[in-house]
């Protein structure tokens, strides 16, 4: 498959709805194309809101990023975990 035919979508999940709202605002300020949406069932069984970013995302550091639960990349077929809070704990 030609890489130019699709873009990577990043799904960023949060511990709270407020975290999602703040992250979306920061993305928009940085020129990152994003929108809020329900969390896909394959990423979480809990009801919640996530931010969908196209082509790039803001990394999990800086203001409000303690609200990020995980970042997953969707390549058109499957999700791959890019960042997860549990993986960062020692």
Please provide the spans of the model-predicted regions:
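A short alpha-helix capping/helix-coil boundary motif
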Residues: 1-4, 38
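Residue-level marker of intrinsically disordered, low-complexity segments enriched
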Residues: 7-9, 19, 30, 37, ...
